[in-house]
């Protein structure tokens, strides 16, 4: 049944959603898979670049816990020449809930919504087709199908980006749907049952997660380039989990750990890494920076990179000798020498 999600390649029906008009943008509801015996719809923001000559590349944007479909996120990609669709995969729209105490990250629901994220795979006791991860993955794949059906979009040049739990969804979808030209996951990953921290405590005895839903189980099938974006102080998704997951993927990988990035939705949008990665992959088919070789010579560590763009002449080594959960370790920055062969 999980593999069937990858067959949702036909464009879903969709309709305009109510709300104040925004120039160059559309609020929409797109049809998704049934839940509890009834049809569901997914709220989304859809936007195209204002200035374009012919079809443009595209990207599907997937929020994390406490998030929704973000108009601003779509606009940021539109400004860079991409068509974009940002989905709300928990049966919500982008209006904050008026109930006191629910202002922080809680959103008004709509009548066609599917399941909401409940705990850490907390609905694993439900039938597969009733679970949140099933519906979030389906909505993501269907959003890609919708975007690919638009004449303004290059159907074979559509990427995928997820933040936090949206990154988990992105990693899950990457292993099920081979159409994405690239995948960017901020924070979220697989190996949550064996990477330490709060997620391991919640999932180490969850047999369904360990044998079916952990993204790493099928990630070798994902041949598209992938970027994993995080930071050393990340408290939710262990860097051990992130590293393990990236090593399972079947295509070119790039990891970017940004000191003091912080965990949230805007933080990855405001960084250049995701945009540079997407542009490079669509231009060359590869990440712009790749590790070619690592070596140890006594107390000296050497890393060789292949890059298709100039590197900052300042280099530092960020390291730790601590044990335990990676987000709680003390990390040290040490100066490093950078020498290059011209790009």
Question: Model-derived features: where do they sit?
Answer:
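Primarily recognizes the serine-hydrolase "nucleophile elbow" in alpha/beta-hydrolase
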Residues: 141-208
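Short beta-strand element of the alpha/beta-hydrolase
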Residues: 43, 54-64, 75, 84
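Surface beta-strand/loop "capping" patches
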Residues: 269, 276-319, 335-342
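Cap/lid segment of the alpha/beta-hydrolase catalytic domain
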Residues: 75-137, 189-201
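The feature captures the conserved acid-bearing segment of alpha/beta-hydrolase catalytic domains
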Residues: 194-248
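N-terminal cap/lid segment of alpha/beta-hydrolase-fold proteins
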Residues: 4-54, 305-307, 337-339
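Catalytic histidine neighborhood in serine/cysteine hydrolases
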Residues: 249-265
């Amino acid at each position: 049944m999980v593999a069937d999600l990858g067959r949702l390649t036909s464009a879903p029906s969709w309709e305009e959603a109510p709300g104040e008009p925004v120039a160059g943008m559309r609020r929409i509801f797109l049809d998704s898979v049934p839940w509890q015996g009834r049809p569901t719809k997914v709220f989304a923001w859809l936007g195209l670049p204002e200035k374009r000559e012919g079809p443009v590349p595209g990207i599907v944007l997937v929020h994390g816990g406490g998030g929704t479909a973000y108009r601003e996120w779509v606009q940021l990609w539109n400004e860079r020449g991409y068509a974009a669709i940002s989905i709300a995969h928990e049966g919500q729209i982008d209006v904050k809930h008026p109930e006191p105490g629910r202002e922080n990250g809680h959103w008004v629901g709509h009548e066609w919504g599917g399941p909401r994220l409940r705990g850490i795979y907390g609905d694993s006791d439900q039938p597969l087709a009733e679970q949140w991860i099933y519906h979030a993955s389906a909505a993501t794949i269907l959003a890609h199908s919708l975007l690919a059906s638009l004449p303004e979009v290059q159907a074979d040049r559509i990427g995928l980006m997820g933040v936090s739990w949206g990154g988990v969804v992105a990693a899950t979808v990457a292993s099920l749907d081979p159409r994405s030209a690239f995948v960017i996951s901020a924070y979220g990953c697989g190996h949550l049952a064996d990477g330490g921290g709060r997620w391991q405590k919640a999932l180490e005895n969850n047999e369904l997660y360990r044998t079916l839903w952990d993204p790493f189980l099928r990630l070798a099938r994902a041949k598209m380039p992938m970027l994993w974006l995080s930071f050393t102080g990340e408290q939710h998704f262990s860097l051990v989990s992130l590293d393990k997951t990236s090593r399972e993927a079947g295509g070119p990988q790039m990891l970017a750990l940004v000191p003091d990035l912080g965990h949230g939705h805007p933080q990855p949008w405001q960084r250049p890494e995701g945009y540079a990665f997407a542009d490079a992959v669509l231009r060359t088919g590869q990440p712009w920076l790749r590790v070619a070789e690592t070596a140890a010579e006594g107390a000296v560590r050497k890393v060789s990179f292949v890059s298709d763009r100039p590197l900052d002449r300042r280099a530092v080594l960020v390291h730790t000798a601590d044990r335990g959960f990676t987000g709680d370790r003390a990390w040290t920055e040490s100066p490093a020498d950078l020498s290059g062969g011209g790009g």
